[in-house]
């Protein structure tokens, strides 16, 4: 069993509860909603930022893309937003926005590309399916593709590394538990069903806690917690800072000579 400190784990749970924790007591929620109904109508709750920042995406040591992201809680749901901008002269811009409920249920996912081509994707749940609608500049009517997947399936879209951070938090909360003053994670990798909207495909991925590593981040040596993310045809290494809310700090994709580093 892999261990992480219980003290640091508490912070991860606080962050994660906004994303996939079980709903609170229904009677208490009903009473609270009744008492505060008029106040809520008059003034929506202010958004609380869980994490925000940017990742630099490097290929063969050269920065090629910057991802700017935020994770916010507001009005009972969490919203994960991200923007990709290319550093090359040929502009490439993409945005994504994902809203999920406290029980992990997907409300809506949107992806848009404004340059060099105009296209968009929307994913929403419908009964036992996730429905993806794809719009391109070449088509006047959106194409629709259903996926037989639970509405709690995670979105892992191409190049949006903040989605990987949310998946890590889900893994830490679901597959680790306190024991003997420490948090222990299951030894075998945990499997998750995910949807990759840009590729119009679903897949199974595996996450596994490896342990502590000493690595260089921006020229300084850091001791970070390493996890492996793998699936059919890929194997990534991810490092999170267990002393700072389990934030994703670095990703290594050796097969593509790619590295992702938090700015």
Model-predicted regions and their roles:
Residues 232-263:
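C-terminal structured interaction module
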Residues 23-49:
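Compositionally biased, proline/threonine/alanine/serine-rich low-complexity intrinsically disordered stretches
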Residues 50-51, 93-94, 208-209, 232-234:
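Short, small/polar residue-rich loop motifs at catalytic or cofactor-binding pockets
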Residues 15-23:
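Hydrophobic h-region of N-terminal signal peptides that target proteins for export
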Residues 47-50, 64, 116-222:
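Solvent-exposed helix/loop surface patches that form functional interfaces
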Residues 39-70:
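Hydrophobic, proline/glycine-rich low-complexity stretches
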Residues 58-138, 244-251:
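N-terminal mature ectodomain segment of secretory-pathway/periplasmic proteins
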């Amino acid at each position: 069993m892999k261990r992480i400190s219980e003290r640091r784990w508490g912070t991860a749970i606080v962050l994660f509860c906004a994303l996939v924790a079980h709903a609170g007591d229904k009677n208490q929620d009903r009473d609270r909603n009744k008492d505060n109904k008029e106040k809520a109508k008059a003034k929506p709750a202010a958004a609380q930022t869980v994490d925000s920042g940017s990742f630099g995406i490097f290929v063969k040591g050269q920065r090629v893309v910057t991802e700017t992201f935020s994770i916010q809680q507001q009005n009972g749901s969490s919203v994960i937003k991200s923007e990709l901008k290319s550093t090359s002269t040929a502009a490439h811009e993409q945005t994504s926005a994902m809203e999920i409920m406290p029980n992990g249920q997907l409300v809506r996912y949107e992806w848009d590309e404004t340059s060099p081509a105009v296209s968009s994707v929307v994913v929403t749940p419908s009964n036992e399916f996730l429905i993806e609608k794809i719009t391109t500049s070449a088509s006047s009517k959106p194409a629709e593709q259903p996926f037989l997947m639970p509405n709690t399936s995670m979105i892992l879209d191409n190049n949006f590394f903040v989605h990987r951070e949310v998946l890590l938090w889900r893994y830490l909360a679901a597959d680790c538990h306190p024991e003997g003053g420490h948090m222990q994670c299951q030894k075998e990798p945990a499997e998750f069903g995910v949807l990759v909207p840009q590729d119009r495909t679903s897949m199974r991925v595996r996450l596994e806690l490896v342990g502590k590593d000493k690595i260089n981040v921006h020229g300084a040596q850091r001791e970070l917690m390493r996890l492996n993310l793998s699936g059919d045809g890929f194997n990534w290494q991810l490092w999170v800072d267990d002393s700072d809310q389990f934030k994703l700090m670095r990703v290594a994709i050796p097969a593509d000579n790619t590295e992702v580093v938090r700015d």
